Amino acid sequence: SAASDVYKRQVSVNAKDLQAGKKLTLVKVDKKTGEKVLISSRTYKVSKDGTVTADTKDAGDYVLLNEKDAKVLSSKILKSVALKDTKKTVANGKKAKVTFDKNLNMENVKKITYTSSKKSVVTVNKNGAIVAKKAGKAVVKVKVTLKNGKTKTVKMTIKVTK
């Protein structure tokens, strides 16, 4: 392969996790913060000789986590899925935006879907932009899917005034 195709990857793993048949999850380590970031829902099985073959697209530092540590990381990330505001009042005809709490690292997010409980009162687009249509109340549901496939739904109640 050409020299331009060579990437440096450093992978860390706890030696006791390299037992044949164990499943490990590959996560990337943010060089600036040291934070572990999800890259996919895929798990890697340790082979009989104690080796693991993992595919990565990007250069960087990675860690292989055992199932327990991967669940702890996933739970921590799911807890960070929160909205800045769970209630908002918007005047009819005006716009608002769904914003996430600053603790959510968007690098862990694969997909976000937004839905309105009453499209006659409030509409919301794929980017979280809200438009107030008429006076009333509606709930905007925000479903966040992480790169490991886990999901969490959070809600924002919108009151539209005349």
Task: Write out the residue ranges for each language-model feature.
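Beta-strand-rich binding/interaction modules
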Residues: 23-28
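C-terminal beta-strand-rich structural cap/linker in extracellular carbohydrate-active enzymes
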Residues: 51-73
